[in-house]
Amino acid sequence: MATKFPKFSQALAQDPATRRIWYGLATAHDLESHDGMTEENLYQKIFASHFGHLAVIFLWTSGNLFHVAWQGNFEQWVLNPLKVKPIAHAIWDPHFGQPAVKAFTKGGVSYPVNIATSGVYHWWYTIGMRSNTDLYAGSLFLLFLAGVFLFAGWLHLQPKFRPGLSWFKNNESRLNHHLSGLFGFSSLAWSAHLIHVAIPEARGQHVCWDNFTKVAPHPAGLQPFFTGNWGAYAASPDTTNHIFGTSEGAGTAILTFLGGFHPQTQALWLTDIAHHHLAIGVVFIFAGHMYRTNWGIGHSLKEILDAHRPPGGRLGAGHKGIFETLTNSLHFQLGLALASLGVITSLVAQHMYALPSYAFIAKDYVTQSALYTHHQYIAGFLMVGAFAHGAIFFVRDYDPEQNKNNVLARILDHKEAIISHLSWVSLFLGFHTLGIYVHNDVVVAFGTPEKQILVEPVFAQWIQASSGKALYGFDVLLSSTNSVAANASSNIWLPGWLEAINSGKNSLFLPIGPGDFLIHHAIALALHTTTLILVKGALDARGSKLMPDKKDFGYAFPCDGPGRGGTCDISAWDAFYLSMFWMLNTIGWVTFYWHWKHITIWQGNAGQFNESSTYIMGWLRDYLWLNSSPLINGYNPFGMNSLSVWSWMFLFGHLIWATGFMFLISWRGYWQELIETLVWAHERTPLANLVRWKDKPVALSIVQARLVGLIHFTAGYIFTYAAFVIASTTGKFG
C-alpha cells in the first residue's frame, strides 16, 4: 500500500480526517518536528535547501532576461530610454478581441505586451548591456548556474558529501568565508565589472568578450596603483555635459568621490559606485581574516562575548552564554538574519528613489513607485518573521540555566517595563496624532481651514539644513556658506552633493511641512504599535502572569480548554497574527505618503499634498478617490483601454481581501456544520455520489482558519494597492 501524505509524520499519515492534508501542509517546513529528525540531519536539509533557493532565484532572473531578449524592445529602449516604454514580455491571450489587442500593443512592437515596471532595463543598461545578444548570454549563463546549484544541493545530501554537525557550528570559519568570500570578493568583483565594462560602455567604448583583455579601463593602466599614485584614478572625471553612453563630455577617471547625480541620467556617478564597491570589498576581505580558526591568531567570538560584561555590573553576567545559545539555536540565528535583512530591504526602498543608482530610472515614475512599494512590503514581512522566530526560539531553544543573569535573561526579567513603555508611547502617539487630524478635519468641514493646527517640523528641517538644504534659511553646518564643512565639501569631498540637495530635480531631502509632520507621527504610531505586539508576543512566549506555563503548550495554541477561560488568543502565534494586520496597516500609511507626495511633485503641484494632507478627508478625497479614477474607468461604455487589466485586478483584490473576513469573523462550529451539510448533499446527488473521498471532512482548526483568513486579507490588500499604484501613476505619466 502506498504511504499517504505526509511521509514525514506517521501519526498524521494515519489520521482518518482531512486534517491530515491541512496539518501536513502546515508542518511541511517545520523540519524539527518531522519523524526521526536528528540535529545533524536538520542542518543538512536546511543547507541543501539553500542551493535550491539560489537555483530558483537564478532561474527566475534567467527568465526575465530571456523574455525581454525574445519579446521585449531592449535595443530600441537603449536608443531612447526616456521616451520608449520598456516591454516585459508579450501577452498571448485567446480572450483578447481586437480592442484588447489594440489597447495592449505599445512600445513600438506589433503585438500585445506587458510594460516592465521593475527597472530591469535601467539596471542592465547601466551595467553595460546594450544588445539582445548580451541578454541571451546572461540568460543562458544563469540557467547553467541554476543547474549547477541544483546539482550542488543534491550532492550535499549524498552520504559522502554531507557536512557534519561540527562543520555547521564552526562560527569563526563561517564568518571568515562569508565576510571575505560572499561580501568582500563579490564586491571587489562587482567593482571590477563596473570599471572594466560598465564605465567604458557609459563613455561609448564597447567592451565585449572579443576585446575586454585589450581595452585598458584607464589610460595609465596599473602604473598609478603600483607606484602609490592612486589619485590619478580620480583625476579627470566625466564632465557635467557628459552624454551617457557616448564619449561626448566623458573623462578618464574610474574611482571618484564626486557626490550628487549625473546631470543627464539623474543617477549616481558610476565612478562613485565603483569606488564604493572597491572600498567595501577591501574592508570585508580584511574583516574575513579577523576570526580565529586553524591557527591560534585572531578573535574568538566566545571570548569576545564572554568578556562583554560592563564593569558597573548593571548588566549582570553580560553576554555570557550568548555564544552557546546562538550557536545551538537556528531560530535565534534566523530571527537575527530576518531582522537585519528587513532593515536593509527598507533602506533599499528609501535609497532606490533618494539616491538612484541606475541611469534614467529616476524619470520612470511608475517604476519608482512600484519599486518603493515592493521593497517596503518585503521589509515588513521579513521584520515580522524576525519576531516570530524570536518567539519560537524562546519556546523551543531557550535554556534558563545557560543564560542565567545575562542580557537575555535580564530582558525577560524586566519585560513588563519594556512592554508598558511601548504601550505608553503608542497611546501617546495615537491620541495626539489622531486628535490633530480629527480637529483639522472638523474645522475644514465647517469652512474654517485657517483654524487647523499646523505644526512645522522644525527639528527635521534643521537636520535637512545641516546636511546642506538651503531652502529653510537655517544657515547651519553644510547650509552655511561660511562653515568649515561647506567649504571642505566643495574642494575635498563630494563636490556634487550640495548642488544635488538643492536642485529640486530629484527626491533627495524633499521639502517638508505640517502634512509631513502629521503623517510622520502617524507612521511612528503604527511602527510602535506593531513593535509592541511583536515584542510582547516574543517576551511572553514562555509564560505570562496569566499563564506561567505557556511554553509547555508550544508556539501556537488557541486556548487551554474551558478550565482556564483566560488562556485564549495569547499564544506567541496570536501575537504574530495580530501584528501582521498592523504591519500591513503601517506599510499602507508609508506607501500612501510616499506615493501621494511624489505624484504631486512629479506633476509640479506639490501644493496639493501640502494643503490636503493635514486632515483625514484630504487623504480620502484627494489621494485615494481622486487617483482611483483610472481604475474605475478601466472598463466603460466606450470599450477598454490599457489600464483595464489593473481595474480588474483592483476589483479582484478587493474580492480576495473581503473573502478573508469570512474566515476571520466566524467560529469553527459553523464551518463543521456547513461541511456536514455539503457532504450529506454530495452523497445523495446522482453522478456526484460516484466520487467518494476516504478522509472524513473536518473543519479547519481555529488557528488554521485564522491563517487562511490572514492570507486572503494580505493577498487581497497587496493586489488592490499594487493595481492602484501602477494604474494611477501610469494614468498620469504614461
Swiss-Prot record:
Where does the chain cross the membrane?
A: 46-69, 135-158, 175-199, 273-291, 330-353, 369-395, 417-439, 517-535, 575-596, 643-665, 707-727
Q: What is its subcellular localisation? A: Plastid, Chloroplast thylakoid membrane
Q: Which SUPFAM superfamilies match?
A: Photosystem I subunits PsaA/PsaB (SSF81558)
Q: Which EC numbers does the record give? A: 1.97.1.12
UniProt topology in membrane = Multi-pass membrane protein
Reactions it catalyzes: reduced [plastocyanin] + hnu + oxidized [2Fe-2S]-[ferredoxin] = oxidized [plastocyanin] + reduced [2Fe-2S]-[ferredoxin]
InterPro entries, per the entry: PSI_PsaA/B, PSI_PsaA/B_CS, PSI_PsaA/B_sf, PSI_PsaB
State how the cofactor is bound: P700 is a chlorophyll a/chlorophyll a' dimer, A0 is one or more chlorophyll a, A1 is one or both phylloquinones and FX is a shared 4Fe-4S iron-sulfur center.
What protein am I looking at? Photosystem I P700 chlorophyll a apoprotein A2
> Whose protein is this, by species?
Rhodomonas salina
Gene encoding this chain? psaB
